[in-house]
Amino acid sequence: METIAKHCHARSSAQKVRLVADLIRGKKVSQALEVLTYTNKKAAGLVKKVLESAIANAEHNDGADIDDLKVAKIFVDEGPSMKRIMPRAKGRADRILKRTSHITVVVSDR
């Protein structure tokens, strides 16, 4: 049984979160949680929360056994970017893009 958890509009760029997502794709959830716990990146905390939510969803909604679960799919899509302005010299301004991402984790017992 596949169970999904999502975090939309996560305040980190998709490029940075994908680096962390690649670390846990296909692993058992216990091993994936361990990897994320000791990964020293902000994105690891975001992905860990989504993975824990997917595990809780599988246990509560589908009655799955946690020991059998593995990360079947994990993907990160780009979310909307917030546009901000950084004032510069001589009346000019630069545009800053504060990027967001949509993190999706699918856990499965197969």
Curated annotation (Swiss-Prot):
Keyword Lipoprotein (UniProt): no
InterPro entries: Ribosomal_uL22, Ribosomal_uL22_bac/chlpt-type, Ribosomal_uL22_bac/org-type, Ribosomal_uL22_CS, Ribosomal_uL22_sf
Biological-process GO terms, alphabetical: translation
Domain of life assignment: Bacteria
Entry keyword set: Ribonucleoprotein, Ribosomal protein, RNA-binding, rRNA-binding
GO CC terms, sorted: cytosolic large ribosomal subunit
Protein purpose: This protein binds specifically to 23S rRNA; its binding is stimulated by other ribosomal proteins, e.g. L4, L17, and L20. It is important during the early stages of 50S assembly. It makes multiple contacts with different domains of the 23S rRNA in the assembled 50S subunit and ribosome.
NCBIfam families: rplV_bact
Protein name stated in the entry: Large ribosomal subunit protein uL22
Organism: Pectobacterium atrosepticum (strain SCRI 1043 / ATCC BAA-672)
Gene that encodes it: rplV
